[in-house]
Design a protein with these regions (language model features):
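Active-site-adjacent structural elements that line small-molecule/cofactor binding pockets in enzymes
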Residues: 1-139
């Protein structure tokens, strides 16, 4: 069971009673503080490492180099900017990102095909973080 937000519970309760935590999208620096708090609480409660996840609204445009423009709880952006943001999130301890295409301007199937072909391969287990495209974004 993953807890979304705080669901009326303390972070200690979530760490002890859930299989992970889904939180809301935040600025990367703010999210880094939140993921650090999550890991500290897990250690303090002697809990196993549990995933930190977040939602992320995207409008993936056809221009792969389009810079991010803020939308509600996410961005309108090209796939290269999406990759860069996902690399940043990965580097601060976000384990899973839940994409929401609600504000998308393209057909969902087309967006999912593009993500599957150009984005997800960089995050497969056989493609370690240090050898992936993330290395160039975070260098």
């Amino acid at each position: 069971m993953l807890v979304t937000g705080h669901s009326g519970q303390s972070l200690e309760w979530i760490a002890a009673n859930s299989d992970g935590w889904i939180y809301y999208p935040r600025n990367v620096r703010v999210q880094e503080v939140i993921t650090e708090q999550w890991r500290k609480i897990l250690q303090a409660t002697s809990s196993d490492d549990k995933p930190f996840s977040q939602s992320f609204y995207i409008d993936l445009v056809e221009d792969k180099d389009a810079l991010p423009i803020p939308i509600h709880l996410g961005y309108r952006l090209g796939r290269n900017a999406l990759l860069e943001i996902l690399c940043e999130l990965h580097s601060i301890g976000v384990n899973h990102v839940v994409f929401n295409l609600k504000y998308g301007s393209r057909p969902a199937a087309e967006v999912l095909d593009e993500i599957g072909e150009y984005v997800l391969p960089h995050f497969l287990p056989q493609n370690p973080f240090s050898n992936s495209i993330c290395h160039q974004y975070l260098a």
